[in-house]
Structures are given as structure tokens and as C-alpha cells.
Amino acid sequence: MDLTNYIASIKDYPKAGITFRDISPLMADGKAYSYAIREIAQYACDKDIDMVVGPEARGFIIGCPVAVELGIGFAPVRKPGKLPRDVVSADYEKEYGLDTLTMHADAIKPGQRVLIVDDLLATGGTVKATIEMIEKLGGIVAGCAFLIELKGLNGRHAIRNYDYKVLMQFPG
């Protein structure tokens, strides 16, 4: 199945010069959405994954069904102030400055094998911060999976030492 047929490209959104890749049409089509989830779960099935981790918000949309498909748990990565218990955090660089991500300090146990799932690999900042938190907690990043990679933004560099899968590529 060619999943690129289920991605809407919106030019000049959210600002001039940017083409936003909208996954809403993919999610609206049950067959395409299921296919994408199964493809990521298939990638993970031989990696002895203990936990799926996904950054808000679209990492939840993709990561939770992958976790269900694998029969394992899901741990959310959130912006500061959104999680009610003790957290670990990591800063990452965005095009307009620093930002921070957090996850519960008890979300990953030492030695657990983790799959990071998100909708988009762009610059790699989000996944790099997520990896930092998982490893700070003693987890092992067994793989990363993304629906889309924006090729020109060099996000692969951030995960060059990790196994990963990308379902679709678009220009950055």
C-alpha cells in the first residue's frame, strides 16, 4: 500500500515556505491506518520490545495502537507540567530556541527494551531528547519508527547509532 496517497501536503503552513504533512487522511482511512500500525509492529516484533514510548501528540496516535498490537505498554512523552508525578526531562533545540520534554521517572525500568514511535522525523530534536530520557532511566532504545521522514532536515543524524524504520519520505 502506498501510504503517501494518504498524506495531505499543505503549502505555506504554519508559515510561508513550509509544507505541512498532514496525517489526518491516513488516520481517517481504516485500512491505511491499520496498515501503517501493522508495518511498525512488524518492524518491532523481533526486537523483544518491552515498552513503546511516543511524544505528544501524534506519537500517541501512532504509538498507542502499536503498543496494543504488540501486547505491551505505552509511556507518553509530554511537555513540562503535563505529567502529575516525578519526571525526568531533556532539553532539545527547535528552530526558534530551546524546548523541554518530560516523562514519568518510573515509566521505564532499567534494562527495558523500548521502541520510540512518532509521526515525523524532521531535525531529530524530539527523538534525541526522548532517547536521552530513556537512557537516563536505564532503558535500552531497541528501535525508532516514524510514519514520515523529511529528508532534507537531516534527522537521521540524531539516530545514526540506533536502528530505525521510516514508512514514507518527503522533501524537507
UniProtKB/Swiss-Prot annotation:
Catalytic activity: AMP + diphosphate = 5-phospho-alpha-D-ribose 1-diphosphate + adenine
Organism from which the protein derives: Streptococcus pyogenes serotype M5 (strain Manfredo)
Pathway this chain belongs to: Purine metabolism; AMP biosynthesis via salvage pathway; AMP from adenine: step 1/1
PROSITE patterns reported in the protein's UniProt record: PUR_PYR_PR_TRANSFER
Protein name: Adenine phosphoribosyltransferase
HAMAP family for this protein: Aden_phosphoribosyltr
Pfam families tied to this protein: Pribosyltran
Function: Catalyzes a salvage reaction resulting in the formation of AMP, that is energically less costly than de novo synthesis.
SUPFAM superfamilies documented for this protein: PRTase-like
Phylogenetic placement of the source organism: Bacteria, Bacillati, Bacillota, Bacilli, Lactobacillales
UniProt keyword terms in alphabetical order: Cytoplasm, Glycosyltransferase, Purine salvage, Transferase
EC number from the UniProt entry: 2.4.2.7
One GO BP annotation of this record: purine ribonucleoside salvage
GO cellular component, one term: cytoplasm
GO terms assigned for molecular function: adenine binding; adenine phosphoribosyltransferase activity; AMP binding
InterPro entries per the UniProt record, alphabetical: Ade_phspho_trans (IPR005764), PRibTrfase_dom (IPR000836), PRTase-like (IPR029057), UPRTase/APRTase (IPR050054)
